[in-house]
Amino acid sequence: MKEFDIEERVEKARRLFKEGGYNCCQAVVLAYNDLFGMDDATAAAIASGFGGGMGRMREVCGSVSGMTILAGFISPASDPKVKADRTANYALVQELAGEFRKKNGSIICKELLGLVPMGSSQSVPAESPEPSDRTAEYYKKRPCEELVGISARIVGEKILQLVNNL
């Protein structure tokens, strides 16, 4: 795997979200897809449905879903008969999500956006599937750019840790 600067990757993810118009999941995946030989169009397509907490349903934060997608490349479990690989993959996903939860209090989009109290697991009706317009007001009231940066840093640190242990 080629070397990379984690700060550049974090800033790239934030920029892709804020200036590029990509959703939170896409921004995290597109910050690292090249390390795994995946082209941008494929990466953006794979991650496209996870924005807004999965299709704007405000469930698992899209940036956490982005880390989960990348976990499949970091610790692949492509053969369902190899239980050890699945266990390692799930452990990595739990580690990444746990670190995000520790830093932010939740991995649930509606809680992170302040739509429901943290830890309440209250149901909120699904919003329109139409994405919000990316205006200055949109960015002012949403923590998403910051959360994208946090996820990009968490997964980047894990990639560097694994590369350094080779």
PLM regions and their residue ranges:
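Polybasic, low-complexity association/targeting segments
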Residues: 1-19
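Acidic-glycine-rich active-site phosphate/pyrophosphate-binding loop
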Residues: 2-4, 31-49, 122-128
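Contiguous domain-boundary segments centered on the initiation and propagation of an alpha-helix
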Residues: 14, 20, 39-43
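Structural signal for hydrophobic packing residues in well-ordered secondary-structure cores
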Residues: 17, 21, 32, 36, ...
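Glycine/serine-rich anion-binding loops at beta->alpha junctions
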Residues: 22, 50-69
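Phosphate-handling active-site elements
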Residues: 35-45, 73-92, 163
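C-terminal binding/interaction regions
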Residues: 90-166
